[in-house]
């Protein structure tokens, strides 16, 4: 009987330690990064930036090309330190409609299980929820209560690497910006780069009997 009690106490102790650890990690996760990192993030993510992105619907890649599609995002900052990520009139490949998305995001530290996945120095996380999803590119709102649309991303402020996923919570549509290094000079070549993507997409459709 005594051994059963000791075993029970041991299990309870382990559980309490686990809960305490999770709580502590959750608190850490909500803390903003060091001010130095936030300053760097503001310098990196500022204005229009072209990134390669895949658009998926129910898990099916609608951009079709392994290199993704050149996509122009906009990043602006508010006085409270939050960042608004915008994507205006986005449609690509075989997507049946254009999407405008705006979401207010906050930066935070990585939690304990994210750090082993990104052991290099400089990584921070940014998240946003209830983003505004619309087909109206003129809608200025950066939130839509209860929309369920979200942003989950990571930025390395030392290497300029970025990756993030936008979940529109609509028809299982997501845009996945896979890990890549930000190159701000792509903005100057955006039109030509997008035209090349459209040519490559047309060839892909032809090769796959869709053109």
Regions found by a protein language model. Name each.
Residues 2, 7, 70-72:
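Sparse, context-dependent recognition of short Cys/His-centered cofactor- or disulfide-binding micro-motifs
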Residues 3, 20-24, 52, 58, ...:
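Generic serine detector
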Residues 3-6, 16-49, 168-211:
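Bacterial Sec-dependent N-terminal signal peptides
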Residues 9-13:
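Sec-dependent N-terminal signal peptides
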Residues 26-30, 105, 110-112, 131, ...:
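Short linear motifs in intrinsically disordered/low-complexity regions
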Residues 41-45, 50-57, 61-74, 83-104, ...:
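A taxonomically broad motif for mature regions of secreted/extracellular
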Residues 63-150:
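Predominantly extracellular/secreted and cell-surface proteins with exposed
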Residues 124-170, 174-186:
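Polybasic, proline/glycine-rich intrinsically disordered low-complexity segments
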């Amino acid at each position: 009987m005594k051994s059963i009690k000791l075993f029970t106490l041991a299990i309870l102790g382990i559980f309490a330690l686990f809960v305490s650890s999770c709580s502590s990690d959750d608190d850490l996760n909500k803390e903003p990064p060091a001010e130095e990192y936030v300053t760097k993030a503001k310098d990196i993510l500022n204005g229009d930036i072209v990134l390669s992105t895949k658009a998926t619907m129910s898990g099916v890649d609608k951009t079709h090309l392994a290199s993704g599609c050149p996509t122009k995002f906009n990043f602006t900052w508010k006085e409270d330190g939050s960042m608004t990520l915008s994507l205006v009139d986005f449609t690509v490949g075989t997507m049946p409609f254009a999407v405008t998305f705006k979401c207010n995001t906050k930066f935070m530290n990585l939690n304990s299980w994210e750090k082993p996945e990104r052991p290099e120095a400089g990584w921070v996380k940014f998240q946003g929820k209830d983003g505004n999803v619309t087909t109206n590119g003129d809608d200025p709102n950066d939130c839509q209560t209860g929309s369920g649309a979200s942003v989950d991303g990571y930025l390395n402020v030392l290497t300029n690497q970025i990756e993030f996923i936008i979940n529109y919570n609509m028809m299982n549509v997501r845009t996945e910006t896979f890990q890549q290094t930000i190159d701000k000079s792509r903005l100057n070549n955006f039109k030509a780069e997008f035209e090349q993507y459209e040519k490559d997409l047309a060839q892909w459709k032809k090769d796959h009997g869709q053109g």
